[in-house]
């Protein structure tokens, strides 16, 4: 759909990933773009593999998936990537590291953060092709070039921002996402739950 606009989802058959975080992000992304999720004919086809197979078999006008699945659909000539939930929402802290305050103060936590910082630097500085070569085994059935293109898109989107700290704004957006889907019932104060990562 070269002329896709988010309002085309209203009344459309949409295969949606019904996992907790993916669905919460999709619902909030749709909301941010001015469409209420209840106006969609959302279809729960099961697991991510079952969702993919259902769309390939002709179910649904649209499908919500996480990369690289939609990019592989496009490469296979089954559909087109028409929008990005990540672009609609912006930076959000949902892939976060959790630990007790005692653990965060430990030498082990410092060593972990050193390795984590290095991996974040690498994923931002390495070519998408190099990263795809290292990660290909985790994505069976995905063409190497498709994986590289997906990684390149995520690099451009800033998914692996070099900073390992959780910013207040990305944390507040996470609260917005999960409150919108009623997965939490109140806003938790940033200063009560977020600490600076250990030096490393």
Language-model segments: what does each one mean?
Residues 1-75, 168-173:
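Bilobed "Venus flytrap"/periplasmic-binding protein-like clamshell domains
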Residues 18, 39, 64, 82-83, ...:
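A generic structural-conservation signal
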Residues 19, 47, 86-87, 195-198:
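Residues that form or immediately flank small-molecule/cofactor binding pockets and catalytic motifs
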Residues 31, 36-38, 79, 141-145, ...:
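Short coil/loop linkers at secondary-structure junctions
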Residues 42, 49-138:
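Pocket-lining segment of extracytoplasmic ligand-binding domains
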Residues 105-183:
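Secondary-structure end/capping motifs
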Residues 174-200:
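Conserved C-terminal helix/tail region of periplasmic/extracytoplasmic solute-binding proteins
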């Amino acid at each position: 759909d070269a002329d896709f606009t988010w309002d085309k989802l209203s009344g459309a058959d949409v295969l949606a990933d019904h996992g907790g975080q993916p669905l919460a992000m999709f619902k909030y992304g749709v909301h941010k773009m001015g469409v209420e999720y209840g106006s969609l004919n959302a279809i729960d086809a099961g697991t991510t593999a079952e969702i993919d197979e259902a769309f390939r078999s002709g179910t649904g006008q649209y499908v919500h998936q996480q990369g690289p699945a939609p990019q592989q659909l496009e490469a296979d000539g089954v559909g087109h990537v028409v929008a990005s939930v990540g672009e609609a929402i912006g930076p959000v802290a949902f892939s976060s590291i959790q630990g007790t305050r005692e653990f965060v103060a430990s030498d082990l936590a410092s060593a972990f953060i050193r390795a984590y910082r290095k991996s974040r630097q690498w994923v931002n500085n390495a070519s998408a092709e190099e990263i795809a070569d290292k990660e290909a085994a985790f994505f069976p059935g995905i063409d190497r070039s498709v994986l590289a293109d997906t990684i390149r898109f995520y690099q451009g989107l800033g998914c692996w921002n070099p900073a390992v700290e959780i910013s207040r704004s990305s944390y507040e957006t996470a609260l917005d996402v999960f409150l919108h889907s009623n997965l939490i019932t109140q806003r938790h104060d940033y200063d009560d739950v977020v600490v600076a990562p250990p030096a490393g």
